[in-house]
Amino acid sequence: MGFARGQKIDVKDLVVEDGYVYANVTSVGADTAGLLPDLMKGIVTGLNFPKSMHWGSLDFHFVRPIRWFVALFDKDVIPFELANVKSGNVSRGHRFLGTGDFTIESPAAYEETCKEHFLIVDPEVRKQMILEGLQKLADEKGGTIIMDDDLLEEVVYLVEYPTALCGEFDEDYLKLPEAAIITPMKDHQRYFPMRDKDGKLMNLFLTVRNGNDYHLETVQHGNERVLRARLDDAKFFFEEDKKHKLADYTEKLKKIVFQDGLGTLYDKAQRLEKITVFLNHKLDLGLDDAKLQRASLLAKADLATQMVMEFTELQGVMGKEYASSTAKMPAWPKPSTNSTSAFVRRRPAADRHGQSPGIADKFDTITGMFSRGFIPTGSQDPLPCAARPSVPSTSSWMPAGTSTAMKSFLRPQSPRRRRGRRSQVMGQLDDLL
């Protein structure tokens, strides 16, 4: 009886077969046009972003204020309203090149109509336009683009109608370390550097404007002026930092807090000295304790330099630069990468003097943060260094006889397997330390 009522049919219409009761129910299809309005609103509200905003007096959040909707089913507008905005078939062209509002007659005409108003809607088409434009300029200048896929992807979504252009800067800036030139270009200005046929950095850069090729010279000069200011800053910081030895900056680490309850960066450097020596003896690496301690003490020193304070992306890179100019270090700790394992395996033992502080740094950060209760419990890891392959991959160069606790802690594991293993990880840390 209850089953029949649930299916909205009479009991006499039920079908009994092989001990089971069936109900034959015919579902009538709904009108597509009637379903689409709610589907359209669901698509918009279903988009999630790490950060969103609300505007006006609306109780509605989105990544940016919504100005208009274009929603078409064939040539008919799909009617709906969201965030006080009604759907229609009218869009707007490029802010500077477009001629204002324009009508989209049908979905099939969408892409071509937008193009007529200087909007390239397909990101793959924009990417191809950018690549072809950059390559053409590089060929004309006899250079090779230092391509960065992440930067390219970012630029693709920064422009609606891309046009590549080339700029230059004073050759005197080439006296700076390469990283001090490339970092402001890529990370701050979204420029693409170039190398000459000998692999040397050129005093040229490539960039992409959001517009056509009109008045490119004016745009070029504007970009050159902005980059010049960035490089002036880098030059000043570099020259000021070079007035002191890298070791002199370790004292300044006493004024930089690492984490509440875990002391300053100077305290962290002191711990690294002890951990590297411990690992050296525990793993029987056969490294020089004095060199390990020296590298550990200097590993964080560049965090107190003006260059790194201004361009944080240069952490470790400038430390190597300053260390090389003031003292002969056997191997400076390189910035963490996903290829730490390969780096260690393919280098002689001398390089491990520089690698060991990096490994010790990860140990110290993970154990310290865990001890303070900062333990990842989901997919959002508050400790990016804990999830990087650079830590677990180091187990590949551990000698025979390494403790099971240490190998277990360093064994590569997927993020999914890490989740929900708090007690197990804490147990491994306890066994290890």
Q: What are these model-derived regions, one by one?
A:
Residues 1-433:
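Amphipathic alpha-helical "coupling" segments that flank catalytic cores
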